[in-house]
């Protein structure tokens, strides 16, 4: 599944640098440079789709990759014909054209599995408690320090929990004074990157009908994309619908008319709290994903980020685009197109 044609070109074209700042579906933050990332005057390339300049390279995200016939890149002298806007180069996109003949129906579909790659290695419970102990003792705190006592308790109770109101309580007063505002303590060895992120699936379906005669040809295409995010909590996806119609009509031997119409509608959903989830520090490894009965867990004023994503609401963005391009071709002299 190719959600954005730019993703298919990464590393495929010499001199073309394509970057992205996020893996969020529909919000990848693509950046394109033809001249190179070290250019003094770095300018975004001019995107031209079927002869019509686009508002920016971001419009590539609205294109159905199955509709694209060719993509060409121009820079320096070859891009000069497009003027000052082409200072960063030109990306020429040509969509598919029909052939005269019998009606042709084509379908393509794909299912892609996203696999989370490199993740930062998080501290284990033992490493975290050792770090807390070393830091506090290095700063001159003694064994009666709240954090020193808490770290030693966490190391001793790793994989278990304490409930001050009963249940599993190894001591009448095991908790340091600075932590007594919390009734329960959990010391699970939790890797929060594995909790928050995981594999995801994307699906794509494309259907086209084309054909015509020597005088008139047509191509109608429909596309559907469902791109799921790797965040395992809350709603995080990009759903896109595409429709494109091309029709050429030969009025006479010298005059022809081309109609190129396209429309897309994109639905993006992301957790409202995703900014704080990504920007906040990962909780200490002892906190659990949920309570014993599967409800959100909080430790004092600390809320685990998975439930912020799950229950914090959604941000929804709907992007609708429509383009109509009419071209009247007049062949004034024989041999000139």
Please identify what each model-predicted range represents.
Residues 36, 95, 107, 207-213, ...:
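Residues on the lipid-exposed face of transmembrane beta-strands in outer-membrane beta-barrel proteins
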Residues 2, 100, 202, 213-214, ...:
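Outer-membrane beta-barrel channels and translocator barrels
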Residues 28-76, 108, 114, 121, ...:
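Periplasmic plug
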Residues 25, 100-188, 225, 229-323:
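Surface-exposed loop/interface segments of Gram-negative outer-membrane beta-barrel transport/assembly proteins
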Residues 12-14, 65-106, 202-204, 217, ...:
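A beta-strand signature from Gram-negative outer-membrane beta-barrel systems
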Residues 6-50, 69-70, 79-96:
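Extracytoplasmic beta-strand/coil segments of soluble accessory domains associated
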Residues 197-216, 223, 307-337:
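Outer-membrane beta-barrel transmembrane strands
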Residues 5, 30-36, 87-109, 178-186, ...:
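N-terminal periplasmic accessory domains that precede
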């Amino acid at each position: 599944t190719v959600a954005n044609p730019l993703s298919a070109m990464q590393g495929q074209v010499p001199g073309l640098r394509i970057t992205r700042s996020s893996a969020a579906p529909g919000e990848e933050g693509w950046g394109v440079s033809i001249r190179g990332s070290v250019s003094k005057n770095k300018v975004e390339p001019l995107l031209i789709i079927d002869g019509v300049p686009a508002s920016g390279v971001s419009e590539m995200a609205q294109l159905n990759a199955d509709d694209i016939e060719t993509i060409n890149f121009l820079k320096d002298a070859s891009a000069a014909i497009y003027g000052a806007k082409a200072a960063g180069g030109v990306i020429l996109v040509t969509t598919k054209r029909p052939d005269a003949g019998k009606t042709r129906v084509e379908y393509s579909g794909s299912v892609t599995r996203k696999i989370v790659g490199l993740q930062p290695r998080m501290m284990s419970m033992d490493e975290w408690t050792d770090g807390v102990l070393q830091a506090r003792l290095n700063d001159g705190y003694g064994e009666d320090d709240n954090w020193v006592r808490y770290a030693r308790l966490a190391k001793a109770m790793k994989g278990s929990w304490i409930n001050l109101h009963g249940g599993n309580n190894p001591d009448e007063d095991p908790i340091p004074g600075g932590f007594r505002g919390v009734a329960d303590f959990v010391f699970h060895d939790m890797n929060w990157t594995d909790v928050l992120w995981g594999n995801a699936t994307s699906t794509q379906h494309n259907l086209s009908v084309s054909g015509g005669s020597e005088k008139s040809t047509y191509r109608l295409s429909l596309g559907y994309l469902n791109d799921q995010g790797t965040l395992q909590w809350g709603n995080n996806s990009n759903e896109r619908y595409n429709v494109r119609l091309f029709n050429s009509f030969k009025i006479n031997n010298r005059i022809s008319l081309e109609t190129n119409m396209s429309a897309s509608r994109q639905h993006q959903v992301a957790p409202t709290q995703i900014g704080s989830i990504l920007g906040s520090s990962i909780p200490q490894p002892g906190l659990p994903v949920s309570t014993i009965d599967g409800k959100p867990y909080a430790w004092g004023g600390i809320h685990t980020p998975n439930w912020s994503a799950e229950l914090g609401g959604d941000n929804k963005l709907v992007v609708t685009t429509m383009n109509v391009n009419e071209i009247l071709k007049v062949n004034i002299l024989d041999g000139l197109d």
